[in-house]
Amino acid sequence: MSDKLIRAIAKDGMIRIFATETTELVDEASKIHDCTPTAAAALGRMLTAGTMMGAMLKSDKEVVTLQINGGGMAKGVTVTAYSDCSVKGYIGNPHVDLPLNTENGKLNVGEAIGKNGGLTVIKDLGLKDPYVGQVPIYSGEIAEDLAYYFTASEQIPSAVALGVLVDRDHSIKKAGGFIIQLLPGADELLGDLLTYRLDEIPSLTTMLSEGKTIEEVIEFIFDGMDLKILEEETPKYKCDCSREKVERALLSIGYKDLKELYDEGKEEELKCHFCNKAYKFTKEDIGKLLEEKEKSIADEVSEEMKKAEEKEKEEKNKK
């Protein structure tokens, strides 16, 4: 069964719904990063959340980045998502391994993430400055933290579910999530009804494991609430790294650091955080970048001198 994301509304548009199955996507990411079950659950939940938040974007030029770091052994998770439902991400420590949560017997994502930190959402909407929203970590379980973010930072009452079920061979058995939001003007009793229904249903991964599709899960939750599915898309894990981007990153470091790399004379290998692809740079490659950096610095100095001369002429003319 392939992954799917759906957008829907209910109760005459008073409820907005994003729901997705991300089993294949999370399995691919877990294999790329060689994740333990705990790391796979943490990264998978963030990727699933990112997929749905990417679907909320209105333009293909917009990008949303989610970061969570609570000082735990996972060392933070970062996810970047796009409007076409593509997503990429990485976890600081993919080999974090903790005992199961003693309260519910599930993978202990909350302890792996930690509570001493925050959840940050960065939206690049193509404007001069990105929108940055940040809230303290509520539980570290990610779904609760994201629900708190929507309510506190965006003032949208939201219910969020994120689940990753890891099989015995460390493959991903099921993964998915939903974000349900009450829009302005919705009756408060509607929120109470939703809370009651969500408290009574099995977990999302349980329903998916029983063979329900993501559509059937949402139809089950919103039975009798005038559910309308508006759109379906296929979420995917996609990294857009390239050698050119890595070269730009090298050029962005200071001249002194780049010169040191060149003087060391060793072949440098840089890995993409998101897909682990390695890019190798010989001394000759770094030398070419160094020349480009030197030219850039010379051009900047020349431009500054030109501006200074023009300013000096203007001041003389005033006299």
Curated annotation (Swiss-Prot):
InterPro entries the record matches: Heat_shock_Hsp33, Heat_shock_Hsp33_C, Heat_shock_Hsp33_N
Span of the signal peptide: none
One Pfam family matching this protein: HSP33
Subcellular location: Cytoplasm
Tree of life domain: Bacteria
Region Disordered, residue ranges: 300-319
GO cellular component: cytoplasm
GO MF, any single term: protein folding chaperone
Keyword Protease set for record: no
Listed SUPFAM superfamilies: Hsp33 domain (SSF64397), HSP33 redox switch-like (SSF118352)
GO biological process: protein refolding
Key words, A-Z: Chaperone, Cytoplasm, Disulfide bond, Redox-active center, Zinc
Post-translational modification: Under oxidizing conditions two disulfide bonds are formed involving the reactive cysteines. Under reducing conditions zinc is bound to the reactive cysteines and the protein is inactive.
Bridged cysteine pairs (disulfide): C239-C241, C272-C275
Family the entry assigns: Belongs to the HSP33 family.
Function field: Redox regulated molecular chaperone. Protects both thermally unfolding and oxidatively damaged proteins from irreversible aggregation. Plays an important role in the bacterial defense system toward oxidative stress.
Protein's name in the database: 33 kDa chaperonin
Organism: Clostridium perfringens (strain 13 / Type A)
